[in-house]
Amino acid sequence: MFTLNKFLLLLFFLGTINLSFCEEENAEEERIDEPDETDVEVEKRFLPIIAGIAAKVFPKIFCAISKKC
């Protein structure tokens, strides 16, 4: 009976450690999947610049193509 208790205790201990490692890996994967704050900042900086340039260039291109200026 004593050896069975030791075995069950060892099994429980190893299972707890294994579960702990799985939770750490899942947390790390979630951190990897989330976009970095710097990436979001870069997108916020360049998107208005590109939109502004497109707003200035598009009417000129449309005017040149349709020739209805």
From Swiss-Prot:
Q: Where does this protein have coiled-coil stretches? A: none
- Classify the main location: secreted
Residue ranges listed under propeptide: 21-43
List UniProt keywords, sorted A-Z.
Amphibian defense peptide, Antibiotic, Antimicrobial, Cleavage on pair of basic residues, Disulfide bond, Fungicide, Secreted, Signal
The function of this protein is: Antibacterial activity against Gram-positive bacterium S.aureus and Gram-negative bacterium E.coli. Has activity against C.albicans.
Q: Record's Gene Ontology CC terms? A: extracellular region
Q: Where in the cell is it found?
A: Secreted
N-terminal signal peptide:
1-20
- Cystines in this chain: 63-69
Regarding tissue, the record states: Expressed by the skin glands.
Family named by the database record: Belongs to the frog skin active peptide (FSAP) family. Brevinin subfamily.
Q: What phylogenetic lineage does the species belong to? A: Eukaryota, Metazoa, Chordata, Craniata, Vertebrata
Any Gene Ontology biological process: defense response to fungus
Name it: Brevinin-1Pb
- Provenance organism: Lithobates pipiens (Northern leopard frog)
Entry keyword Transport: no
